[in-house]
Amino acid sequence: MSGESMLNRRIRKQFGKLDKIVEIPDLIGMQKESYGRFLQQGVPPEKREKIGLQAIFQSVFPIKDFTKSASLEFVSYSFGGVKHSVAECIQRGMTYEIPVRIRVRLVVYDMDETSGTSSIRDIKEQEIYFGAIPLMTDNGTFIINGTERVVVSQLHRSSGIFFDHDQGKTHSSGKVVYSSRIIPVRGSWIDIEIDPKDIVHMRIDRRRKFPGTILFKALGYTVKDILDYFYTKERVFVRKKKVFKAFSEDSLRGQRATVRIKHPETGDLIVDKGRIFNKTVLKNMKSAGIDMVPIRPEDVVGAVLAAPLADSSTGEMLADAGDFISEEVFERIGELGIEELQILFIDGAGSTDSIVKTLLLDKVNTKEEALIDIYRRIRPGNPATPEVAQDFIDHLFFKPDYYDLSAVGRLKLNHRLGANAPVSLRTLRREDLLLAVKTLIHLKNTQGPVDDIDHLGNRRVRAVGELLENQYRIGLVRMERAIKERMSLQEVDALMPHDLINPKPVSAVVREFFGTSQLSQFMDQTNPLSETTHKRRLSALGPGGLTRERAGFEVRDVHPSHYGRICPIETPEGPNIGLIVSLSTYARVNGYGFIETPYRVVKDTKVSKEIKMLPAFEEGEHPIAQANAPIGKDGRYVNPVVIARVAGEFSMIKASDVELMDVSPNQLVSVSASLIPFLENDDANRALMGSNMQRQSVPLARTSAPLVGTGVEKVVARDSGVAVVARRPGEVVYVDSGRIVVRHDTDDKDPEAKPVTVYNLSKFIRSNQNTCFNHRPIVKKGQRVAPGDVLADGPATEKGELALGKNVTVAFMPWGGYNFEDSILVGETLVRDGVFTSIHIEEFEVVARDTKLGKEEITCDIPNVGEESLVDLDESGIVRLGAEVKPGDVLVGKITPKGETQLSPEEKLLRAIFGEKGGNVKDTSLRVPPGVSGTVIDAKVFTRRGVEKDTRTRMIEEEEIRVLEKNRDDEIAVIEEVTRERLKALLTGQKCDTPVKKGKKTILAKGDKITAALFDEVPTSQFEKLAVTSDSVTEQAHRVFEWYRTQVDACREEFEARISRYGAGEELPPGVIKMVKVYVAMKRVLSTGDKMAGRHGNKGVVSRILPQEDLPYFEDGTTVDMVLNPLGVPSRMNVGQILEIHLGRAARVLGDQISTMLEEKKYKDLKKKLSAVFNKEIPAAEIEAMSSARLCEFASEYKDGVHMETPVFDGAKEAEIKALLKEGGADETGQAILYDGRTGQPFDERITVGTMYMLKLHHLVDDKLHARSIGPYSLVTQQPLGGKAQFGGQRLGEMEVWAMEAYGAAYALQEFLTVKSDDIAGRTRMYEKIVKGQNVLDPGIPESFKVLTKEMKALGLDVTLIEQQDKE
C-alpha cells in the first residue's frame, strides 16, 4: 500500500480469518434501483421496458369513447429539468421534483353503419404537461415540502397460489379440511376447498361457496372432459357371465385379488384370494402372459362409468359418464351382450371419488346453466342471460384489464402447479384451475405439506417504485373515467388532446402518497447509521399489509428462510416487534421482489469463486455449508464431514454432498448488528437493543472512530452519503472549511470531460432530528485522490469511518451506590474536555401574511417592547448572527394590524401627537421558546415576487453570489492551467509563424523558437491566434483552444443560470408576503440525567459527574473516565462488552507504547513494534523502508490506541487478546490494581478495566427538563394541559394524593387540588393576594367538581351544594 493512499485510510489490525469473497453491495442500492426502474429516466422512449411508468401508460391507454368513434393513444413520455437543487428545496419548503410530459395521439374514426367497419378520419398528436413527479436524491430520499422523507419498502404476501389446511379445527370429526387460494395483484380471489365429505367447493371473492365442477362446466368442459382429466380409466370385459379387467401394473399395484389367479398353462397358483398384488406377483403375471385379470361381478357394481353406456340397437341411454353402475344396469349389460365398458380407476388412496361426488351434487347440465348459476351467486340482484354471464366470467379471470396475476403470480403458479405458461401471461388459463384442483386433491390424498405463508418464498418486497406505480395507476384510472366522459359529451373533431387530459387526479394521488402514506416516513436523520437503516427497512404494515393488532406470533417470529435475507436481530421493541425488520448486509431484492442472498458454488467438494444469488424458494433442498467451514489451499474442504443447512435444519453431512457455501459470516445480520464487535458473545435480546440504540446515538462535536471495530464502519460511512467522496481521480488544488477544489487527470475515455470539480461542503445544517450536519475536510492541498476516497467527513464519521461515540476508559466496579440499577458514574474530565459535547440546531420560522385587516410587517419597530429586548435585531427586524439568545428573546420582530376600536378622546390626542403606529397594531414577534438557549448561526429570508427586498435579504443574497463567483473563478483558473500545460507540451520547441505581443511589446517575433518559460509570462488567451510552422501542431493548438472556450462558456452559463434565481423573489404559499427562518445552535454538554449506552445493549443514565481527584486511578496516576456496574453483565448475558473492554485495553496500552517511542525518538524499536502489531496488514519490509518523517506521520495515528477490526462471528479469540495484552505490557487477565481517589488506598480486588466505545443517546435531559408556573388550561376541566410541548403541568393521581395524605400535608394538598389546578376564582384571588403581599390561601370549588355535578344532573340526579350559612 503506497504511503500516499495510507494518509486518509486508517489501517486496522485484522482478526478476521476468512478472506473477503464478495464486497458488501451498495447499502441504499435497493431504493435507487427500484425508483430508477420506475422512471427509466435516462432510457430513450423506444428502448424502455414495459415496467414502471411505461407499463402503467401502456395498460391504461388507448382510451376509447363509449361509441368507439375516437381513441386517445399513448406515444411516449419525457421529463423536464430540475427547477431547484436539493438544498434550495429544503430551505424554501418545496418539493424536489421534475415535470412529466406525455406525447399522446387523438385518432378520430368514421364509422360505416352498414358494414360496421371504421376508417381513420383524423389524427392529432400533441405533447402535454402531465404534472410533476418527485425525484429521488442521490442518497435515496425524497424532499417533500422541504422535509427529507424515506419511502419504506413493504413486505407483503406474494400473489400466486397457496395451499393450506385448518389442522382439523373446523369440523367436529377432526378431519383436516384442505384448501387453496389463488391471489392476483388485481382482480377476484378464488378459494378452493375439499370438505370432510370429499366434495370440492369453490368460492369467488369470499362469497357463498358452490360445487367446483359448476365452474368447470361454465368454462366449457363436459362431464366426460372433467372425468378424463382427473381419473385414469380401466377397461372391463364381460365374457359369458365372467368379468375380467385389463391387466395394468399401475392400477393393480397395491390392490387385493378378489379371486384366485392361476397360471393359464401350468395351473400353478400365482396369487391367492385376498392377497396383495406386489412387485413379484405382477412380474409373474406378466411372464405368464395374463392380459385379462378375473374379478367378481360385484366388483363392477358400484364403480363409476367413464363413458356413456347405450343400447346399440335402440340407442337408449343406460347410464351416463359419471354415473355409478347399479345392479339393474349390470344386469342389462349382460342381457344386451355388451362385452366391454370403461370405468374410472378409484382406489380410495391415490385416487378418490371427490370429483364424482361433486358432479353428482352440482345439479347443472349445460354450460349456459352453469354460467347463469355462478352469475346469480355473485350478482344476486341482476337479471342473468347466458351472454351477460359469459362476459362476466371472462372479465373475472381472463381479461388483463380486470385480472392481473403479475409476473410474480404467474411465476409462483407455474412453480407450484408444475405448469409452463409464459411469465408474460398475467391472466388465468382454464387449465390452471383444473391443475389447482388436481394438486389440491393430490395434497389431501397424500396428506402432503402445505405452504408456509411466513416463508420468504411466499412473501415479497414492494419497494418505492412498485408502491408509487400502484398509486400512479389509481390516479390514471380516475383520469381515464373523466376522459371517457369528456369524449362522449363534446364533439371530438373540434378537440385537441390537451382538452381531454387533466393531470390533476394523478398529481393529487402522487402528492397524497408522498405526504400521508404510512410508508412515506419522515427520515430518521439522527446519525448516518439511522439514515442508512431507515432506507433498508422492511415493514409488514401499511396499506394492503397487516395491522399491529391482528398480526400473530408466527408472522413476527424469526423463520429459517430469513437466513442471509432478513436480520434476526434488528427489529423494534414493543408492538411492532417482528413486523418492522431490516435487510441483511449482503441481501438484495430481485426483479420479482423476492429477497436474494449470495452463495459460493461448490463443485466436487471444491469451493469455486462463482457467486450465485438465490431467493428463498430456490434454496430448497440444497445443502449449504457455513462461511467458516475450513478450506485447504487447494480450495477443498479440510474435514470429510461439514456442518451444513438443509431446508433450514442444521446437520453434519459429507463434504462431497455440499452444493453451496455462505460468502461471509456476517451475511446473517443487518448493518446495525454487524457494527457490534463480539456479537457472537451477546444474548440476542441485548444485541437487539444494541443495534437499535446505535441508531439513536447523537453525532458529537469531536468524533473518533471505535478502537475496537468490525470493519463495517467504513462501508456505512461510504454508502450513507454523509461524507464527501471523490467522484474522479485527481489532485486537490484548494481546500477550506466550505469547499474543496479537485483538478482531474485527463480522461482518455472522455477527453471533453470537465477538468475540475468544486465540492461545496455543508456547514452546520439542521437535520430532521435537530442534530448538526457538518462537513470537515480531511484532505490537504496537493494531495492525490482516487475515486471513492473520502474528501470530507460528515457528522459522526472520522477518516471515512463511522464514529458514533467515543473511546473511554471504563472500570467495572461499584462506587458509592452511584451505579445502582445501570446508572453510570462519569468523570469530570469528559465534561471539561467536551468529549461528549454535541451541537443541536433548532429552526424557528415566522411568516408575514396579508390579513383582512392589512399586511403584517417584519420590523424592528415593535410597540411596548423595551430597547434592551431589541438590541440584537438589525434594521430589518431580524436577529443578528452570533447573538446569544435565551427563552423569551425576540428573534424576529413582527407586528400585526388590530381591528379598529372606538377611541377615547385621550387616545385620540396621543394618536395625533405620536403618529399612527403603536395603537392599531399588536406585537406578534417570534420569540425563543422556553428551554432553548444558544447562538444564532443563520437566518434565511424569503420574499414574495414583486415585494421589495429588505437590507438583510440583499446581504444574504450577495454573500451567496460571492460564493458562486468564487466557485466559477476557481473552475476557470483550473481550466486555464490545464490549457496552459497542454499548450506548453504541444508548442515548446516549435517555431513561431505569427508574432506574439504583450501589450505593445513583442515577446516573440516570427521565426523565434517557443520556450517553456514563455508560458509563465504571457496570459493563455494571447496564444489563441498563434500559428507555428507545422500546420498539424497549429491545428491541434486550435483544438485545445476550442476545448478551452467550450469549458469556460459552460462554467459561465452555469453561473448565470444559478444567479438568475436571485432577482425575482420566491414562490411562496398564497397570502404570504415574507418568510424568515432563524437557526439557533445549542451546545449540549454531558450532564446528569443523559442516557448513554455501549454497543451491546448496556444502557444507563448518568447519575453523577465526579471530580477527577475522586475517581479511581491506575498506578501511573491516570484516572478512569467512567465507572459501570459489574452486576449489569451476568444476568443480561452480553459478555461481548467484557471482550471489547479487554481488546480495548490492549489497543490502548499498545498506543501508549507507540506514543512513548515517538516522544523518545526510538525509531528502530517503533518499527519493530509496528511490525509485531500489523504483522498481517503491512509487510514488515514496507515498515522497515519508511523514512523517519513518514514513520512519525504513520505512527502518530496510533498514539491514542491501535485500531482493531474484529468482524462479527469471525472475531478475535481469547488467546489473541491475551497475546496482545502481553505485547502491550498489561496483565493477561485484563484486570488491574486501581486506587481509590478519595483515600489513595488500592481497592481490595483487581478490577476489570479497559477501553469501551460509549455512545450518547438522543434522550437528553435538557430536552426533557421542563418547568411551569402558569400556562394554558384545558377548556372543559380548566386543569393545566399536560406535556412539555403544551407547556403543561404535572398531573397528580390518586396514589400521589394518598402519599400527601399519609404525610399529613393537608394545606399543600389543598393547594394542589384547587388553586394550582382548576379552581378558577381561587386562582384569581391567589394572584391578587400575592400582588398585595398577603400569602394566604383562599380556595373555592374546583371546576372538575362542577363537571361531576353536571354529569350527575344529566343522569337525572338533582345535586345542589348546601353552603355552611344556609345550614345554620
UniProtKB/Swiss-Prot annotation:
The EC number of this protein is 2.7.7.6
Give the top-level enzyme category.
transferase
Catalytic activity entry: RNA(n) + a ribonucleoside 5'-triphosphate = RNA(n+1) + diphosphate
The answer to keyword Repeat applying to this record is no
Q: Which GO terms describe its cellular component?
A: DNA-directed RNA polymerase complex
Q: Which UniProt keywords apply?
A: DNA-directed RNA polymerase, Nucleotidyltransferase, Transcription, Transferase
* Keyword Transferase set for record: yes
Molecular function GO terms recorded? DNA binding; DNA-directed RNA polymerase activity; ribonucleoside binding
One GO biological process term is: DNA-templated transcription
Stored Pfam families = RNA_pol_Rpb2_1 (PF04563), RNA_pol_Rpb2_2 (PF04561), RNA_pol_Rpb2_3 (PF04565), RNA_pol_Rpb2_45 (PF10385), RNA_pol_Rpb2_6 (PF00562), RNA_pol_Rpb2_7 (PF04560)
Report the superkingdom from the record: Bacteria
Q: How does it assemble?
A: The RNAP catalytic core consists of 2 alpha, 1 beta, 1 beta' and 1 omega subunit. When a sigma factor is associated with the core the holoenzyme is formed, which can initiate transcription.
Say which family it is in.
Belongs to the RNA polymerase beta chain family.
Q: What does this protein do?
A: DNA-dependent RNA polymerase catalyzes the transcription of DNA into RNA using the four ribonucleoside triphosphates as substrates.
Write the protein's name.
DNA-directed RNA polymerase subunit beta
The species this protein was found in? Desulfosudis oleivorans (strain DSM 6200 / JCM 39069 / Hxd3)
